[in-house]
UniProtKB/Swiss-Prot annotation:
Organism field: Clostridium botulinum (strain Alaska E43 / Type E3)
Any single Pfam family the record assigns to this protein: Ribosomal_L33
InterPro entries on file: Ribosomal_bL33, Ribosomal_bL33_CS, Ribosomal_bL33_sf, Ribosomal_zn-bd
Keyword set includes Ribonucleoprotein: yes
Matching HAMAP family: Ribosomal_bL33
Identification of the protein by name: Large ribosomal subunit protein bL33
GO-annotated cellular components: cytoplasm; ribonucleoprotein complex; ribosome
Record keywords: Ribonucleoprotein, Ribosomal protein
An annotated GO BP: translation
Gene Ontology terms for molecular function: structural constituent of ribosome
Annotated family: Belongs to the bacterial ribosomal protein bL33 family.
Amino acid sequence: MRTKITLACTECKQRNYDSMKNKKNNPDRLEMNKYCRFCKKHTLHRETK
C-alpha cells in the first residue's frame, strides 16, 4: 500500500516536496538530496509526519 509523504528541508525546515512511498518495502524515514528553492541550493530532505 502506497502512502503520501512530505519531504522537508533539513536546513530551513520548509516542506517542499510531496511524494509516495510503499511502507511495506521502506518502513524507515526517507532521505533524499533535493533542490530547496528557499535555500537556493541542494540540501538533504527528510520525510515528515
